[in-house]
Amino acid sequence: MNQKPKEISQIYRLENGFWNPINNSSVVLNKINDNILKVNNNFTNIFDTIVLPEEYQFLEYIMGNSVPYIMTDVIPNGNTKVIANIYFDAASPSNMAVFGSRQSNSSNTFVFWQINSSTFRSDYATTQASISVTTKGHYNIRKEMNTTHISPTLVGGSSGLVNFTSPVPMTIFTINTNGTLASNKLVGRVYSFDIYDKYTLMRKMIPVKKVSNGICGLYDIITKTFYPSSGAVNFIGKEFISLPSDYIELESITSTGT
């Protein structure tokens, strides 16, 4: 009996500690330099090294403001899985497109939406599954074929697996409908984006900056491909900040007005 392969975790062990992309304040202490990171994914004493070409530098995230987006070269099908680490900066006023592609609203769909302040929607084949949760905030989204988990509870799904193929490549920060891009693009930050064909990791995309010109985007360490914005403006990227050991970086601070 074949065992299900271990997928690469969203929490990494580094040589001197741990890196969780949701709270990665210590990661800079474990980098060898701006383009080399030593990690392992199953908490053993064997470490892999993620090495970027010297022309790129690791970023904590890239941020979109409803204009930039990424056009991948991956066409989703019924066995596609995405594991994405995303912070949603605002509650969507109406149907903010997050990632995916489809033939039409109800045909050959593999897409994810931020519908409003309390609803995500995950579409698969011909099914649309609403997910009730506060949408502003930081989430691990695991859209695995016909089911969807969010940090990490099962919160949406369809009746079963379907054999289908989208006619167009998947996009990130928007949705590709048979070649037409949704105008209501994501306002938020992407920390990592992994694409699987069932259990095979096809793309492992991490935020980087091109040192020569400052352009930010996602770098796929599988195919060694850089994906900058395909939109009219570039992404904004945040570099890692090295803090003293007695401080941690917060997502935000809030005032009560008193």
Language-model features and meaning:
Residues 157-189:
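Flexible glycan-contacting loops in extracellular carbohydrate-active proteins
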Residues 132-151, 196-198:
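Localized edge beta-strand/strand-to-loop motifs within extracellular or lumenal beta-rich domains
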Residues 2-51, 70, 74-76, 207, ...:
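N-terminal low-complexity, intrinsically disordered "leader/linker" segments enriched in small/polar
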Residues 53-121, 197-203, 241-258:
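Extracellular glycan-recognition modules
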Residues 118-138:
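Short, aromatic/His-centered strand-loop micro-motif at the edge of beta-sheets
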Residues 79-83, 136-138, 145, 169, ...:
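Extracellular structured ligand-interaction cores
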Residues 32-35, 50-54, 191-243:
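Extended recognition patches within non-cytosolic domains
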